[in-house]
C-alpha cells in the first residue's frame, strides 16, 4: 500500500505541512505532525488535549482505502498564531512509553514460572496491555528474576535479551502491546526500492562476538537502508536482492501529500543482542520475611511482592563457615525479618543476611516479662538476678555492653561486662559473675556425673550442702543419710573419729 495522503484523528488539519514518523525495535519511536487548523478550533483542541489521549495517523491510498500506520498517545501539543492563521504541532508516542516512566521493584521466585507469565504480570498493570513472546515464552525462568529500580520497559527489554532478541512495540494498535522476538513468515514481501545504501557495522559484530552472542557471522552486521513508498511495519520480513531481511527501523516523511519511507534492513541473526543485566542491583538489598528454613538455606517473602509466594531457597549468611564443617550455625526462624542481598548483577547469586534490630512486639515482650516474673519467685537469689538483669529481649538492646542471643522460646545467652548468664526461660539458669561467683538455679533436678573424680574444694571458706528433706552420700555399698531427725551411717565398716 502507498500513502497518497494522511489523516490525523481526532484532529482535523486543513493542511498538513510536515509529518515525521520513526519506528524502531527496542525503542518507543515517535511521530510529529505540523499543519494548519481552523482558528475556531484552537480552544477546543487545547481543551481536549490531555494525558493518555489517543491519536492515530492513517494512510489513505489512491482508491480511498485507509489504514492506521501509527497509534499512540499525545505527548505534546502546541498552537501558534501567525498572520491570522493557526498552526498546530503535535508529538505522539506509542503506548509503551507509559511503561518507561516509573522504576519498579518486584521479584519472580517460582522457578517453574514461564517467561510469558512474567510478562503477563508486568503488562497487567496497563490498560489494554499485552505481550506476545515469539521466542522463549514457554521457557521456565529457572532462577529468581528481580526487577529492581527498572521501568517495566527496561525490564521487558532485559528479559528479551535473555533470548538474545529484541522488543517491538505495536505501533498500530490501541493499548500497551509489544512483541518479543521476530516471526519467520511463510512468505516475504518483495521490495523494489528507488535507491538504497549498504553499511557494514563491523564494530557491532565484534561487540556481540565478545559478549558471547551465538549463531552470528560477520555478514550479519550488514545493514541496507532503502527508500520505498510502499508501507511496511517494523519487524516485517521482506525480500531484497534475493535475500530475506527484517525491518529494524522505519522513518517516514511527508513529501507534498505523499509519504515516503526509509527502511533499515538486517538479517534475522543481525537482530541478536547480548544478554543484559541490571547493574543497579549490585550491592542492593530487599527487605523480607522468612517463610521456611531447611539446613543452611531459607525461603523468603519479599515485602515488594505483597502476597506473592516464595519459591527459591537462598543461602543464609553466617559470621564464619569452613568447608570442614566448622563454623557458626545460627539460622533464623519463619517470621523473622531479614534482607535479601545481591552482591553481583546476577539475581541467582543473592543470599539472605540479617536485618536491623526491630522493636520488640507486645506479645513477645509480655511473654518474656511473664516468664521472668514467674521465675523471680523461686528463690531470693533468683530474685536478685532477675531484678538486675531482665531477660526481656528488648532490655539487652538498650545496653551495647550486652551481647545477647535470644530465641523465640525464651532461651537466652547474655554476655555482659561482669557476668555470663544462661537462661532456659523455664526457671533454670546458670550465672557466672565476676563479683558474686557462680549461681546455679533449677526448677528441676541437677545432675553432676563424671567418669573420673569430682573435686569440690573451698580454700577460703566453707562448703555447704543442704536439702529440704535429707542429704544422702553414697559410695558402692556404703551410705550416709542426713535428715532432720537422724544421721544414719551404713556400710561394711563404719569409723567415726
Regions found by a protein language model. Give the residues of each.
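Amphipathic alpha-helical and helix-coil boundary elements used as assembly
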Residues: 1-497
Amino acid at each position: 500500500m502507498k500513502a497518497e495522503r494522511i489523516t490525523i484523528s481526532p484532529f482535523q488539519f486543513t493542511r498538513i505541512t510536515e509529518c515525521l514518523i520513526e519506528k524502531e525495535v527496542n525503542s518507543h519511536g515517535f511521530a510529529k505532525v505540523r499543519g494548519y487548523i481552523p482558528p475556531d478550533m484552537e480552544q477546543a483542541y487545547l481543551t481536549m488535549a490531555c494525558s493518555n489521549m489517543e491519536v492515530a495517523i492513517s494512510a489513505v491510498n489512491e482508491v480511498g482505502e485507509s489504514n492506521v500506520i501509527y497509534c499512540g498517545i499525545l505527548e505534546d501539543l502546541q498552537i501558534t498564531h501567525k498572520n491570522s492563521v493557526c498552526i498546530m504541532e503535535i508529538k505522539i508516542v506509542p503506548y509503551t512509553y507509559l511503561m518507561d516512566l516509573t522504576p519498579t521493584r518486584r521479584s519472580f521466585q517460582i522457578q517453574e514460572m514461564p517467561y510469558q507469565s512474567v510478562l503477563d504480570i508486568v503488562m497487567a498493570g496497563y490498560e489494554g496491555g499485552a505481550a506476545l513472546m515469539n521466542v522463549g515464552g514457554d521457557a521456565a525462568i529457572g532462577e529468581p528474576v528481580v526487577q529492581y529500580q527498572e521501568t517495566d520497559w527496561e525490564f521487558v527489554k532485559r528479559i528479551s535479551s535473555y533470548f538474545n532478541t529484541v522488543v517491538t512495540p505495536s505501533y498500530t494498535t490501541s493499548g500497551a502491546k509489544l512483541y518479543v522476538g521476530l516471526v519467520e513468515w511463510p512468505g516475504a514481501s518483495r521490495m523494489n526500492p528507488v535507491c538504497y545504501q549498504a553499511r557494514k557495522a563491523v564494530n557491532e559484530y565484534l561487540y556481540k562476538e565478545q559478549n558471547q552472542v551465538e549463531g552470528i557471522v560477520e555478514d550479519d552486521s550488514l545493514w541496507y537502508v532503502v527508500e520505498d513508498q510502499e508501507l511496511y511495519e517494523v519487524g516485517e520480513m521482506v525480500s531484497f536482492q534475493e535475500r530475506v531481511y527484517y525491518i529494524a527501523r522505519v522513518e517516514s516523511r511527508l513529501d507534498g501529500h505523499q509519504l515516503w519511507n526509509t527502511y533499515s534492513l538486517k538479517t534475522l541473526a543481525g537482530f541478536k543482542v547480548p544478554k543484559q543485566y541490571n547493574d543497579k542491583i549490585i550491592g542492593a538489598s530487599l527487605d523480607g520475611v522468612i517463610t521456611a528454613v531447611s539446613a543452611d538455606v531459607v525461603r523468603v517473602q519479599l515485602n515488594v511482592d505483597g502476597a506473592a509466594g516464595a519459591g527459591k531457597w537462598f543461602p543464609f549468611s553466617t559470621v564464619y563457615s569452613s568447608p570442614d564443617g566448622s563454623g557458626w550455625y545460627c539460622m533464623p526462624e519463619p517470621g523473622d525479618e531479614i534482607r535479601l542481598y545481591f552482591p553481583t548483577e546476577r539475581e541467582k547469586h543473592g543470599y539472605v543476611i540479617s536485618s536491623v534490630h526491630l522493636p520488640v512486639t507486645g506479645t513477645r515482650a509480655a511473654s518474656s516479662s511473664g516468664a521472668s516474673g514467674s521465675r523471680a519467685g523461686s528463690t531470693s537469689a533468683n530474685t536478685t538476678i532477675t531484678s538486675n538483669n531482665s531477660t526481656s529481649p528488648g532490655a539487652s538492646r538498650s545496653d551495647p555492653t550486652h551481647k545477647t542471643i535470644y530465641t523465640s522460646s525464651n532461651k537466652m545467652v547474655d554476655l555482659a561486662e561482669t557476668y555470663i548468664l544462661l537462661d532456659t526461660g523455664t526457671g533454670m539458669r546458670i550465672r557466672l559473675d565476676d563479683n558474686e561467683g557462680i549461681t546455679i538455679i533449677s526448677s528441676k533436678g541437677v545432675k553432676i556425673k563424671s567418669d573420673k573424680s569430682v573435686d569440690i574444694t573451698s580454700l577460703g571458706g566453707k562448703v555447704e550442702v543442704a536439702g529440704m528433706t535429707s542429704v544422702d552420700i553414697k559410695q558402692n555399698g556404703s551410705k550416709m543419710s542426713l535428715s532432720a531427725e537422724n544421721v544414719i551411717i551404713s556400710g561394711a565398716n563404719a569409723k567415726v573419729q
